Amino acid sequence: MKTLVLLSALVLLAFQVQADPIQNTDEETKTEEQPGEEDQAVSVSFGDPEGTSLQEESLRDLVCYCRKRGCKRREHMNGTCRRGHLMYTLCCR
């Protein structure tokens, strides 16, 4: 059950990342890397305010990053992110 909830949240996260508004053409055609562009944090929370069994420490806060060059230590790949026409790796811990 917990796995199903986690996978559902990741699918919703992927849809949300793809639903970002389209940026101006000038911004999309830039090829130089901007400071902080590689790491974009996303936080996902499970459960309701009253608390449920799903609010364990391991599921309470899932932090994901869209990275250009692969996942860092203690992170695992959960798919891909797309921002404009660029593809990134979705890394979560």
UniProtKB/Swiss-Prot annotation:
SUPFAM superfamilies per the UniProt record, alphabetical = Defensin-like
Q: Which residues form a coiled coil?
A: none
Subcellular location, principal: secreted
Summarize tissue expression.
Answer: Paneth cells of the small bowel.
Which cysteine pairs are covalently linked by disulfides here?
64-92, 66-81, 71-91
Q: Which UniProt keywords apply?
A: Antibiotic, Antimicrobial, Defensin, Disulfide bond, Secreted, Signal
GO annotation, cellular component aspect: extracellular space
Output the InterPro entries linked to this UniProt entry: Alpha-defensin, Alpha-defensin_C, Alpha-defensin_N, Beta/alpha-defensin_C
Biological process per Gene Ontology, one example term: defense response to bacterium
Q: Where is this region: Disordered?
A: 22-54
Q: Where in the cell is it found?
A: Secreted
May I ask which residue range the UniProt record assigns to the signal sequence?
Answer: 1-19
Annotated propeptide span(s): 20-58
Family (UniProt): Belongs to the alpha-defensin family.
Q: What does this protein do?
A: Probably contributes to the antimicrobial barrier function of the small bowel mucosa.
- Entry-linked PANTHER family: ALPHA-DEFENSIN 1 (PTHR11876), ALPHA-DEFENSIN 1-RELATED (PTHR11876:SF2)
**What protein is this chain from?**
Alpha-defensin 13
GN (gene name): Defa13
